[in-house]
Amino acid sequence: MERMKQKIMATFEDFQKIDIRVGRIIEVLDFKEARSPSYKIKIDFGELGIKASSAQIIKLYHKEDLLNRQIVAVVNFPPKRIAGFKSEVLILGVMKEDGEVILLQPDREAPLGYKIG
């Protein structure tokens, strides 16, 4: 139950440093070069532009089910190279015990690029 352990206490100022935004998935490709089965995903964040990410979510989501889905992502982490692919944002989700991820999304249509707070 390692996932259930609470992490160290963070301050409100720590939280304010993280820029979490609403985006819409506009492209999903198989990421064959990745070590674990993954997708390459392009996300439209409105005025922030289109950003790329990778996600190990193929067991719970088919590519066609992800297109046009709104998601929530951290947009101000430094880019990370994954098997030669530049991942620019971190898509947020709920971590299940088996390691699968359930994507977080607004419960209503939200303007692209709007902040989560």
Place the predicted regions along the sequence by residue:
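Phosphate-backbone binding interfaces of nucleic-acid-interacting proteins
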Residues: 2-117
